[in-house]
Amino acid sequence: MVSNPDGYINLCEIDPMTGKQLSSSKRIWNGTGGRYAEGPHIYKKDGWYYLLISEGGTELGHKVTIARSRYIDGPYQGNPANPILTHANESGQSSPIQGTGHADLVEGTDGSWWMVCLAYRVMPGMHHTLGRETYLAPVRWDKDAWPVVNGNGTISLKMDVPTLPQQKMKGRPERIDFKEGRLSPEWIHLQNPEAKNYTFTKDGKLRLIATPVTLSDWKSPTFVALRQEHFDMEASVPVVLQKAGANDEAGISVFMEFHSHYDLFVRQDKDRKRSVGLRYKLGEITHCAKEVSLPADGEVELVVKSDINYYYFGYKVNGIYYDLGKMNTRYLSTETAGGFTGVVLGLYAVSVSKESKMYADFEYFKYKGK
């Protein structure tokens, strides 16, 4: 069962062992008229086949709709109350949660029903920099055997539900050390990374081998990142350049797309004098907003803070904090920059030439959300 770029849902039989298609594809539902009818799920309950899909695209018009049939290949009849979940209406349009969609239905071991879906949190002005997140909402079945989500087809940051068995989830530690000699699964790269450019030292530091591929190239730079999970947060990382040539650099990037990122970096000139700088890339514009000299000695720790309005950039030398400036959050939002996977905080190393032997060592990465 797949979505079609023309905006309808197809069904065919496959061999679950090989994936081979065993029957021709059949159109079974067009949805309710929203664009991008996609993400189909089928469930059998009480003699009905329920077809759950998403429409509207993963934007403000996202919605979840449902149809059913006595036969798996149709005909399917839509729920008169569609959409069963959306915030593109009077009830949901002022919610801090938007873009609800791509849902699934789950029955608990106690017989309760739930919907899991994705959505994103917005800032004032309906901009969002955080990526899509997973939400859970209670479901009941009405007298006509249709599912009703959270009473009114919307979700909230807090919902009153029957208590389920509780299990405390282990969160991300505020300080991430690299002593284990490996990166945990939540670390991500751009494109297909060159594994040889990511190593670990004997004393437990992450070592990034610089290449001439920059963060604005449609390739895979030496870059490894974690997702920003909070509007209000603080991240910091110490950076040590080794064997750096003139203008080789390493640092931390607040990264949305190849064409939209803020870079906080350390580099040195031809006389091996160190500096720290703040640069932004927004569309066709690349500009170094500020760059200042660093003392010859002393550990440099790069610091990025944020709230709903700004990213704040600075650095510490020998534990003393210095401010470098701020940049508006909305320039990295989906609504301005495009994309929809959210901002990441990435450690990177870039050299001027292929002949450079530069690498950068990172002892730890700190992240604290508020």
What are these regions (language model features)?
Residues 1-370:
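Carbohydrate-active catalytic/glycan-binding domains of CAZyme proteins
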